[in-house]
Regions:
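Single conserved hydrophobic/aromatic residue that forms the stacking wall/gate
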Residues: 1-10
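Membrane-embedded transport module
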Residues: 11-175
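C-terminal membrane-solvent junction of multi-pass transporters and transport-like membrane proteins
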Residues: 114, 118, 175-195
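Hydrophobic alpha-helical transmembrane segments in multi-pass integral membrane proteins
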Residues: 132-136, 194-209
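Hydrophobic alpha-helical membrane segments
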Residues: 161, 166, 188-203
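Alpha-helical transmembrane segments
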Residues: 163-167, 231-239
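Extracellular/periplasmic helix-loop-helix junctions in multi-pass membrane proteins
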Residues: 205-221
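Membrane-interface capping segments at transmembrane-helix boundaries
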Residues: 237-248
Length: 248
C-alpha cells in the first residue's frame, strides 16, 4: 500500500501545474512574484539591448551615406557589445524581485514579450540618441583633418555614455520608481556602472590605434559625462510626473 500510494503521489506531482511541498499558499505568491520579476527584468534587458542596436546600426549606416569615416570601428563595437550583453545582463540580473509586480494584471501566455510601451521606448529613445549622434557626425565632417581623430574619440565616448545613463532608466522600466529608491538595486547598478566607466576611460586613454582613440583631458571627460546625464534626469522627471498623476 505504501509503495502504491507513493507512486500515486509521484504521478499526481508530475500531472499537476503547481506542487506545494510545504503546505503553504505563501509559496505560490512568492513563486509568482519571482516569475513576474524575472520576466520584467528580461523585458528591461531587451529594451536596453534593442535601443543600442538601433542606434549603433543606424549611426554607422547613415554615417556611411554622409561619406564620413566610420563613426564606430569594429573594436569599438566589440566594447559596445560587451556593455550591451555582459554588463547589462549583470546589472539587470542584480535587480531584486519586487512585490509591486503582484499588483499588475496577469498576462496571457501567448502575449508577445515586446509590449507597446517597450516599442515606444526603444524607438523614442533610439531616435533621440540618433539625432544627437548624426548632428555630431555632420559637425565632424566639417572639421579640419587634424581634429577628426579627437572628435571621433569624443563621438565614441558620447555614444557609450548615452547608453551608460540609459541603462539606469532601463533598470526601472515598467515602473514609476526612481533609480535611487532601492539601495540594494542602486548598489548593484553602481558596481556595474563603475566597471563600464573605468573600462571606457582605459580604452580612450590607452586604446590607441587598436580602438582608434586619442586621450582626452579631464574637463572633456567632465563635459561629456555631465552633458549626457540628461538621459537619466529626463527619465527621473518623467517618472516623477507619473507618480504625481497616479496619486491624483
Amino acid at each position: 500500500p505504501y509503495r502504491r500510494q507513493r507512486q500515486m503521489c509521484i504521478r499526481d506531482r508530475e500531472a499537476s501545474d503547481i506542487t506545494l511541498l510545504d503546505d503553504s499558499f505563501h509559496s505560490i505568491a512568492t513563486a509568482v512574484m519571482w516569475g513576474r520579476s524575472l520576466y520584467k527584468n528580461i523585458q528591461r534587458f531587451i529594451v536596453f539591448q534593442l535601443t543600442i542596436n538601433v542606434v549603433a546600426l543606424a549611426s554607422v549606416l547613415l554615417g556611411a551615406f554622409f561619406g564620413t569615416e566610420l563613426p564606430l570601428t569594429v573594436t569599438q563595437m566589440l566594447w559596445v557589445n560587451l556593455i550591451m550583453d555582459t554588463f547589462a545582463a549583470m546589472a539587470l540580473a542584480s535587480i531584486p524581485p519586487s512585490a509591486d509586480v503582484m499588483n499588475e494584471k496577469p498576462r496571457k501566455t501567448d502575449d508577445f514579450i515586446i509590449t507597446k510601451a517597450m516599442r515606444k521606448n526603444i524607438l523614442g529613445v533610439g531616435f533621440c540618441f540618433l539625432a544627437i549622434l548624426m548632428t555630431l557626425i555632420v559637425i565632424i565632417k566639417q572639421m579640419p583633418a587634424d581634429l577628426v581623430g579627437q572628435a571621433l574619440t569624443q563621438f565614441f565616448t558620447i555614444f557609450v555614455m548615452l547608453q551608460f545613463w540609459n541603462l539606469f532608466n532601463a533598470s526601472v522600466f515598467g515602473t514609476n520608481h526612481s533609480v535611487f529608491k532601492d539601495s540594494r538595486h542602486a548598489l548593484g547598478m553602481l558596481s556595474v556602472a563603475i566597471i563600464i566607466l573605468v573600462g571606457q576611460i582605459l580604452i580612450v586613454e590607452f586604446g590607441g590605434k587598436v580602438f582608434r582613440t586619442e586621450p582626452m583631458n579631464f574637463m572633456t571627460w567632465v563635459y561629456i559625462i555631465a552633458g549626457t546625464s540628461f538621459v537619466l534626469w529626463i527619465g527621473e522627471i518623467y517618472r516623477w510626473i507619473k507618480r504625481i498623476q497616479k496619486k491624483d
